[in-house]
Regions:
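Unchanged
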Residues: 39-62, 72-125
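Conserved N-terminal beta-strand and adjoining loop/helix that marks the start
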Residues: 1-19
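Catalytic phosphate/metal-binding cores of nucleic-acid and nucleotide-processing enzymes, i.e., regions
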Residues: 68
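Conserved Nudix-box catalytic region and its N-terminal flanking loop in Nudix hydrolases
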Residues: 17-55
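C-terminal regulatory/oligomerization modules of transcriptional regulators
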Residues: 128-130
Length: 130
């Protein structure tokens, strides 16, 4: 088993819609994911989430709500510990991203698009508030 990679993900939400990134690079190429990425040395998960949001969307948010930690364990090289954050916004304009295409998608649409299986629990937690 490989060493776990540590990442921060930020779910950006506007009412019932989520701003998701259709990735053009690995990991999860061709799948819709929250924005985020790996932590840098000596960086807190929250600072990493803010940095990744800005790098991938150009947006800045100060108020991020911590939702929990998602641990993925696999016999492959896909092993992650991800700190999950939520930001609720009134922004509707879709920014451009070098990481792929950003889209506002309703929660009901998410089950019909390609997403990592582990992300289902993230969206369900945010919608159900538990």
């Amino acid at each position: 088993m490989s060493t776990k990679k540590i990442a921060s993900l930020c779910v950006i939400k506007n009412k019932s819609k989520f701003l998701l990134l259709k990735r053009i690079n690995e990991p999860n190429i061709g799948k819709y994911v929250p924005v985020g990425g790996k932590l840098k040395d000596h960086e807190t998960p929250k600072k990493a989430a803010k940095r990744e949001v800005f790098e991938e969307t150009g947006l800045k948010f100060n108020k991020l709500e911590f939702c929990g930690v998602l641990t993925e364990t696999s016999p492959t090289n896909y092993n992650w510990i991800s700190y999950i954050y939520l930001v609720e916004t009134d922004i509707v304009d879709i920014p451009k991203s070098n990481e792929g295409k950003l889209e506002w998608l309703d929660f009901k649409e998410i089950k019909n698009i390609p997403t990592p299986k582990t992300d289902d629990i993230i969206y369900k937690y945010i919608i159900d508030k538990k």
